[in-house]
Amino acid sequence: MRPSQEVPVNPGSHKCPVCGMAVRIIRRADGKADYYEPLEQHEVSNKLDPVDVITSNKLKLLREGKKTVAFVGMALTSCSLAPYDDENVEIWGVNEQHAYEWMKRWDRWFQMHIRPYYTRTFDVPGVKEHYPWLCEEHGKPIYMLNVDEEIPDSVEYPLARMNKRFFSKIRRGDEKVKYYTSTMPYMMALALDEGFERIEIYGMEMAGPDEYVAQRPCGEFWLGMAAGMGVEIYLPPDNQLIKGYLYGYKGQGY
């Protein structure tokens, strides 16, 4: 399979050598590179390539006969590679990504933030107002922290049920552990609870500084939970999740 999305970038920008995301190089006074600064969605071309035909056909064969869901986040390396043309796969989206052309269809949505977040004005060129979109009738569930009466498709996320199923035997002292540090774990818990047999993840890298510390360990915990339950996991070739050197075999151990 070919590498993940070759992200088209505007003049003056580059690709991160680690994750492939579009970045701007910040230079010192002497002109030498100092560090990378990630670009925002609107700074990158809205025209991203879909998955190639060969890879698409291979993945369709691997999904055959399996209840499959694709999570789609906003990382530009693979967000457009999701199986939008395979109606046998549920597509679960998040936040304001409905504004972008690569988000061609969806079956369920997740907006797991407090009301001031999703009602705010997005001062981003080309992005449709998020809250008015949420207030439209889509006829599909939008999972939220609580039902919002202004949002006709809003559904309260079944957190108590997820906690009872997945965390009843995990404690820190006398405290029952609850471990969801981003939207992806909520999606994963629901998919596992509903018996999905295959989970594909697109546009979720958790490679940024804020994500890497708090969100990535939790995301990888849930990937491990899924694998332990016998669920198939598919990540695009260059995805940064559950990726590292082989301790002892590659590099010196401790």
Report the location of each language-model feature.
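Short Cys/His-rich Zn2+-coordinating modules
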Residues: 1-6, 52
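Short metal-coordination and nucleic-acid-contact micro-motifs, chiefly zinc-binding Cys/His arrays
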Residues: 10-12, 34
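Short cysteine-rich clusters marking metal-coordination/redox-active sites
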Residues: 16-19, 37-38
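Short, non-ligating residues that shape and space the ligands of small metal-coordination modules
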Residues: 25-26
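Cysteine-rich micro-motifs
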Residues: 31-46
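Metal-ion/cofactor- or nucleotide/acyl-coenzyme-handling active-site neighborhoods
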Residues: 48-254
